[in-house]
C-alpha cells in the first residue's frame, strides 16, 4: 500500500515519497509533508533554475540558493521566477 501524506504544497492527501530524498531536518520535513507529485513539480523548477542561472552544485552558495528556493516553493507557496520563461497556456 502506498504511503500517503497531507501535502503542504497541494493542500491535499497524496502519495508520499518512497524514501527521504534530501538530507537532514529539511529532508525529514520534505519526506513527512511533500507528495511525489509536488516533488516532481519542484524537480522541474529546480532543473530550470540550475540551467538558467548556471548554478554549480559544487558551489556552497549555489546549493544554499537552491535550497532557499526549494523551501519557498514547497512550504511557502512562492513560485520560482525564471527569467525569460513563459509557460504554455494551461500549464500555469
Swiss-Prot record:
InterPro entries xref list: Fe_traffick_prot_YggX, Fe_traffick_prot_YggX_sf
GO cellular component terms, semicolon-separated: cytosol
Top-level taxon of the source organism: Bacteria
Record's keyword terms, sorted: Iron
The keyword Iron appears for this protein: yes
GO biological process: cellular response to oxidative stress
GO MF term set: iron ion binding
NCBIfam families the record matches: PRK05408.1
Stated role: Could be a mediator in iron transactions between iron acquisition and iron-requiring processes, such as synthesis and/or repair of Fe-S clusters in biosynthetic enzymes.
Protein family: Belongs to the Fe(2+)-trafficking protein family.
Protein name in the entry: Probable Fe(2+)-trafficking protein
Source organism of this protein record: Shewanella sp. (strain ANA-3)
Amino acid at each position: 500500500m502506498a504511503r500517503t501524506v497531507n501535502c503542504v504544497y497541494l493542500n491535499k492527501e497524496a502519495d508520499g515519497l518512497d524514501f527521504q530524498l534530501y538530507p537532514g531536518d529539511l529532508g525529514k520535513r520534505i519526506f513527512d509533508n511533500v507528495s511525489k507529485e509536488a516533488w516532481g513539480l519542484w524537480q522541474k523548477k529546480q532543473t530550470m533554475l540550475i540551467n538558467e542561472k548556471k548554478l554549480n552544485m559544487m558551489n556552497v552558495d549555489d546549493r544554499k540558493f537552491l535550497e532557499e528556493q526549494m523551501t519557498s516553493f514547497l512550504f511557502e507557496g512562492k513560485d520560482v521566477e525564471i527569467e525569460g520563461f513563459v509557460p504554455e497556456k494551461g500549464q500555469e
